[in-house]
């Protein structure tokens, strides 16, 4: 390496380090406070639920902050998600329901996709507004279990499992699924599916027998969802904001309070997304409210 090349490499390394440091400091400062408006009683909270729902903690933290803020008269939630983990979706659902029950209005605006778990978290809102072309629905549960025994046989590798009882290694990728395994796992999926149905039936006031006819995992447009009673109205994010402002008695253009994620969450989300893309295929078994 000649001198000129060495100098160039050093300069690039210094610039990368400097940019990374500035970004880190900027994110840290942004995470220290939330974008609060001046007092005046014309504020709405604004929260986004985006991407695969894998962890509820940051969303729940933001929801609680909005619920406690006296300047926030109502909360507008933008959902742009195909769903995700069963537990994470239910925890977000429970927090939204708690806020609504305590008297602070919540309106959901559905984006391009608000399906399965994305729909699940929307159900406790006072009002759901979807775009006519929003992809929603997909009421159902999926469990994925890869079997890699054939691959191991090809490379000459064998895995021995010592277990306490017959069902202890159920779902193992190292052996074929038995009929007993399938029956037990189907029971788990069916139970979680029934929980999903019960939530939608209760929150949307749809009889179970009517709901079961459309809750077969199918996706639908926002317009179709409205016909089935799964959403309340069709409109844009601005329409949802206007409706919420009217519900809160706010005249004129309301100011939005947008919570900023904390720095640890930003990095954790980054690595989760990277892991999902690189190693998602081996994160099994898992059970999800998710549309592919």
Where are these regions (language model features)?
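Hydrophobic/aromatic residues within transmembrane alpha-helices
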Residues: 121-122, 225
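Pocket-flanking alpha-helical
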Residues: 118
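N-terminal organellar transit peptides
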Residues: 1-108, 113-114, 127-130, 144-292
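Zinc-dependent metallopeptidase catalytic helix centered on the HExxH motif
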Residues: 125-141
């Amino acid at each position: 390496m000649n001198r000129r090349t060495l100098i160039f490499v050093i300069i690039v390394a210094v610039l990368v380090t400097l940019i990374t440091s500035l970004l880190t400091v900027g994110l840290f400062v942004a995470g220290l406070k939330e974008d609060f408006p001046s007092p005046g009683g014309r504020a709405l909270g604004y929260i986004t639920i985006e991407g695969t729902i894998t962890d509820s903690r940051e969303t729940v933290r933001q929801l609680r902050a909005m619920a406690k803020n006296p300047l926030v008269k109502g909360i507008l939630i933008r959902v742009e998600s195909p769903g995700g983990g069963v537990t994470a979706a239910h925890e977000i659902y429970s927090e939204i329901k708690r806020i609504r029950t305590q008297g602070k209005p919540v309106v959901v605006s559905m984006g391009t996709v608000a399906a399965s778990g994305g729909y699940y978290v929307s159900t406790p809102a006072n009002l759901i507004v979807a775009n006519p072309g929003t992809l929603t629905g997909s009421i159902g549960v999926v469990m994925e279990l890869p079997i890699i025994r054939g691959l191991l046989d090809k490379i000459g590798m064998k895995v021995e499992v010592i277990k306490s009882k017959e069902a202890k290694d159920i779902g193992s990728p190292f052996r074929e699924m038995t009929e007993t395994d399938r029956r037990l796992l189907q029971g788990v999926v069916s139970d979680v599916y029934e929980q999903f149905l019960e939530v939608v039936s209760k929150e949307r006031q749809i009889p179970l027998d009517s709901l079961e006819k459309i809750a077969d995992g199918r996706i639908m447009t926002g317009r179709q969802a409205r016909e089935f009673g799964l959403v309340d109205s069709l409109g844009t994010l601005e329409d949802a904001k206007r409706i919420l402002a009217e519900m809160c008695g706010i005249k004129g253009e309301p100011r939005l309070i947008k919570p900023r994620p904390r720095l640890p969450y930003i990095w954790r989300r980054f690595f989760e997304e990277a892991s999902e893309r690189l190693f998602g295929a081996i994160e099994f078994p898992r059970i999800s409210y998710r549309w592919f």
